[in-house]
């Protein structure tokens, strides 16, 4: 089987905690995922939610664990290049699917993504990576940013709710021998961190370590609806 990634891309992922992958996904996959989201919105799972608290305004929507419910998502899980990409990034012989989800931010939505790392939302250990696949061309200021090297801090942070207000869930504590701390104030101390961010065309993606902090750096309001699919 031919390799998909270069050694430099793998090195970037391991050292920086996130890597930009150019044109790894055919436009047909993008269209299938967009169709899948449309189907999901018209017939959502019990886990579907809006993170926007106000009613009758542009919203920030999400659904997850729906790959087995939406044929387009299931096909992507089994047949897209991502399983091989993940295996190459993590030097793994076998890849397990932990979670699938999608986010859609409607044009004009004032809701944003809080800074968080995904590892806090899962009660498991192991080496994990996450796909961030935009389904529309996305400029740097329209997507999320990643805090370079934060996956190597050897820290766990409390979960942050995506709903407007971004409430931190719980208090500092030790769970299963791991200390969970308050998330750092990234937005209030932007000069202390180095951020990774990219303009993405269709077919481009970012893959990041489950421990890498990421979120919205500014409060830009999109003038078009933006969606992304993650695994």
Q: What would you call each of these model-derived segments?
A:
Residues 140-213:
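Double-stranded beta-helix
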Residues 82, 92, 107-110, 136-140, ...:
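Short, charged/polar surface micro-motifs in flexible loops or helix N-caps
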Residues 117-132:
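Acidic, His- and aromatic-enriched active-site or binding-groove loops in soluble protein domains
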Residues 130-133, 148, 224-231:
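A short hydrophobic beta-strand segment most commonly corresponding to one strand
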Residues 41-55, 159-164, 202-207, 211-231:
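Non-heme Fe(II)/2-oxoglutarate
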Residues 101, 117, 133-137, 146-148:
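Short, structured patches in soluble enzyme cores that scaffold and shape functional sites
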Residues 1-16, 22-115, 121-122:
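Non-heme Fe(II)-dependent double-stranded beta-helix
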């Amino acid at each position: 089987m031919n390799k998909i990634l270069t050694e430099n891309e793998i090195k970037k992922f391991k050292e920086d905690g996130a890597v930009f992958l150019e044109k790894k996904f055919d436009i047909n996959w993008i269209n299938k995922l967009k169709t899948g989201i449309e189907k999901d919105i018209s017939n959502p799972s019990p886990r579907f939610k809006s993170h926007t608290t106000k009613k009758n305004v542009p919203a920030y929507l999400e659904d997850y664990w729906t790959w087995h419910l939406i044929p387009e998502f299931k096909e992507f899980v089994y047949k897209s290049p991502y399983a091989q990409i993940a295996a190459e990034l993590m030097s793994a012989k076998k890849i397990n699917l932990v979670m699938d989800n999608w986010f859609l931010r409607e044009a004009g939505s004032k809701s944003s993504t809080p800074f968080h790392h995904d590892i806090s939302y899962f009660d498991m250990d192991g080496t994990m990576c996450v796909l961030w696949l935009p389904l529309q061309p996305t400029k740097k200021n329209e997507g999320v940013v990643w805090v370079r090297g934060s996956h190597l801090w050897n820290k766990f942070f409390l979960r942050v709710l995506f709903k407007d207000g971004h409430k931190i869930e719980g208090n500092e504590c030790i769970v299963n021998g791991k200390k969970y701390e308050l998330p750092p104030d990234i937005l209030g101390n932007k000069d202390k961190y180095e951020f990774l961010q990219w303009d993405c065309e269709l077919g481009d993606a970012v893959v990041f370590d489950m421990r890498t902090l990421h979120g919205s750096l500014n409060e830009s309001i999109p003038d078009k609806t933006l969606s992304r699919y993650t695994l």
